[in-house]
C-alpha cells in the first residue's frame, strides 16, 4: 500500500517467463483465464497433458491471464514467504500467481471460499471489494454473478 516496490523481490515477470518456458508444466500446474470468454484447457494443453508454451504465449498476447498454481514449488522466494506465514498463522499456506496482460481482466466478479492474501508485485489494477455476499461460503456453493457488478 503506497510502497510500489515493497514486494518486487518476491516474483518478477522474468520469473514467470522462466517457469513457463523452462519447465515441463502439466495441466493443473498452469491454467489460463479470460473474463471476456470461456477458455478450454484443450486450447493450451497437449494430448499428453503438458502445457503448450506457444499456445500460452499466444493466448496471453490475446488477453488471457496466466495462472501458476502452487507457484511456491517453483520459486524459492515464494516458498520462504509461505513458510514464514505458516509459522505466523500455524496454518498451511500456498501461492497461486496471476499474470494478466495490460488492459485485460482474468476473472469476472467472484468470491473465494477460502482466505486470500493478495500481494500485487507489479503493474496496476483497480480492485473492487464488496460486502460479504455469503457469511461463510462453502466449497462449491453457487455465486450469482449478476448480483455483484
Give, region by region, the residue ranges found by the protein language model.
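Active-site region of the double-stranded beta-helix
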Residues: 5-9, 17-18, 22-148
Amino acid at each position: 500500500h503506497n510502497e510500489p516496490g515493497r514486494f518486487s523481490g518476491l516474483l518478477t515477470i522474468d520469473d514467470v517467463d522462466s517457469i513457463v518456458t523452462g519447465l515441463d508444466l502439466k495441466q493443473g500446474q498452469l491454467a489460463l483465464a479470460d473474463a471476456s470468454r470461456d477458455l478450454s484447457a484443450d486450447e493450451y494443453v497437449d494430448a499428453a497433458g503438458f502445457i503448450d508454451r506457444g499456445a500460452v504465449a499466444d493466448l496471453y498476447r490475446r488477453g488471457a491471464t496466466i495462472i501458476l498454481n502452487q507457484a511456491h514449488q517453483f520459486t524459492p522466494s515464494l516458498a520462504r514467504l509461505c513458510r514464514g506465514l505458516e509459522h505466523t498463522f500455524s496454518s498451511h499456506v500456498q501461492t497461486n500467481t496471476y499474470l494478466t496482460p495490460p488492459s485485460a481482466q482474468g476473472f469476472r466478479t467472484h468470491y473465494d471460499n477460502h482466505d486470500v492474501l493478495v500481494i500485487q508485485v507489479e503493474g496496476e489494477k483497480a480492485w473492487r471489494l464488496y460486502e460479504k455476499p455469503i457469511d461463510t461460503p462453502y466449497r462449491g456453493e453457487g455465486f450469482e454473478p449478476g448480483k455483484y457488478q
